[in-house]
């Protein structure tokens, strides 16, 4: 009897540059990416989401409408993937949908996290059971609700005699530390592409700095870099997580303190800032003769950022997850397909040593197609 099952993972990250979908085959714990797609996010929807995420005035009506629109967007993305792959909905066991994070507050008196994208709409429109709301049970157990992907990394990248660190550079950068003799660790190191993208969009009207062309026109401003490195989040102990609530244009504007920096120098400095905050954390976990850093996410396509990581981590073998046979562009979408698989099989999917939760738990809520 075949144990193979098909799941779809849907991910819209902090960069909000589109919806990543991954069609994934599971044969027990063996994982194989069958097909993938990028589905564009309408510009007006992205702008409305960005305004909510950066703390601009909103109301329940707007939040409800965004939740509805995103539900339809995610359903459209799933149907587009199935059409491209020539796969019928009846063949899919479930969808794992992350949703669009608009606020994440894991600390304080009332911790909470909010992801939009009505899973009822996804399930009924696609006629596929949908698992969503993955983060809040971990938070109910005292955890950060993030990061969740290290558990998937642990299942995919076998431990060897040296440390393997999986680095995802999305809007935020996060690491999964797979040590040969110690429990898995994982946390957000700080900004990934978020500040670079925001500054680039403000000054060049491009969503991101393609091939680091803008940054390469500038030079690192050491005074500004030192100011950025004073950010208290960087000095907190793990478990910890962050997002657009902290690292946004308001934060950056405050750090610039009205100084008249050249825009290209700021871009170059932000790239250096991202590289330094990542490499400082990665270097803490060097162990064994051949420690390796596997990079995934959009930042892996930034040649300047990758060059600086290689230079700052000279004792590490730096490559992408693609070199290990796992798509770096669809890693997170694959992870949420895996989380849906774990939910339906009633298997734990958080790592308390990563998130700070009090115990293991099967994450997510099932939204039935029926």
From Swiss-Prot:
It catalyses: 1,6-anhydro-N-acetyl-beta-muramate + ATP + H2O = N-acetyl-D-muramate 6-phosphate + ADP + H(+). It is an enzyme of class 2 (transferase). ATP binds at residues 13-20. One of its GO terms (molecular function) is ATP binding. GO terms for biological process: 1,6-anhydro-N-acetyl-beta-muramic acid catabolic process; amino sugar metabolic process; peptidoglycan turnover. Keywords: ATP-binding, Carbohydrate metabolism, Kinase, Nucleotide-binding, Transferase. InterPro entries: Anhydro_N_Ac-Mur_kinase, ATPase_NBD. Gene3D superfamilies: 3.30.420.40. Pfam families: AnmK (PF03702). Belongs to the anhydro-N-acetylmuramic acid kinase family. NCBIfam families: PRK09585.1-3, PRK09585.3-2. This is Anhydro-N-acetylmuramic acid kinase. The lineage of its organism: Bacteria, Pseudomonadati, Pseudomonadota, Gammaproteobacteria, Vibrionales.
């Amino acid at each position: 009897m075949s144990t193979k099952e098909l799941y779809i993972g849907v991910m819209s990250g902090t960069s909000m540059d589109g919806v990543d979908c991954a069609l994934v085959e599971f044969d027990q714990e063996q994982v194989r990416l069958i097909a993938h797609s990028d589905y564009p996010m309408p510009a007006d929807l992205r702008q409305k989401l960005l305004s909510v995420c950066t703390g601009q005035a909103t109301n329940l009506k707007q939040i409800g409408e965004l939740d509805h629109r995103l539900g339809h967007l995610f359903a459209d993305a799933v149907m587009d993937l199935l059409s491209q792959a020539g796969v019928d909905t009846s063949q899919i066991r479930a969808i794992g949908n992350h949703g669009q994070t608009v606020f994440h507050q894991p600390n304080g008196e009332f911790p909470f996290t909010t992801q939009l994208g009505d899973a009822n709409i996804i399930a009924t429109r696609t006629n596929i059971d949908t698992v969503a709301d993955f983060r809040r049970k971990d938070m109910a157990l005292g955890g950060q609700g993030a990061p969740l992907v290290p558990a998937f990394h642990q299942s995919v990248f076998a431990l060897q005699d040296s440390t393997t660190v999986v680095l995802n550079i999305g809007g935020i950068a996060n690491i999964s530390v797979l040590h040969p003799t110690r429990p898995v660790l994982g946390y957000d190191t700080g900004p990934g592409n978020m500040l670079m993208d925001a500054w680039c969009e403000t000054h060049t009207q491009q969503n991101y700095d393609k091939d680091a062309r803008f940054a390469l026109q500038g030079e690192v401003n050491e005074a500004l870099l030192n100011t950025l490195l004073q950010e208290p989040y960087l000095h907190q102990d793990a478990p910890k997580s962050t997002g657009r609530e902290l690292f946004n244009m308001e934060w950056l504007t405050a750090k610039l303190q009205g100084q008249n920096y050249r825009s290209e120098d700021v871009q170059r400095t932000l790239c250096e800032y991202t590289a330094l905050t990542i490499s400082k954390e990665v270097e803490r976990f060097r162990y064994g003769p051949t420690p390796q850093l596997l990079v995934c996410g959009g930042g892996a396509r930034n040649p300047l950022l990758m060059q600086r990581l290689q230079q700052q981590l000279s004792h590490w073998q730096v490559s992408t997850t693609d070199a290990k046979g796992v798509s770096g562009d669809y890693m997170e979408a694959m992870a949420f397909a895996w989380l849906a698989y774990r939910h339906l099989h009633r298997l734990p999917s958080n790592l308390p040593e990563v998130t700070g939760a009090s115990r293991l738990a099967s994450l997510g809520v099932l939204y039935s197609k029926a």
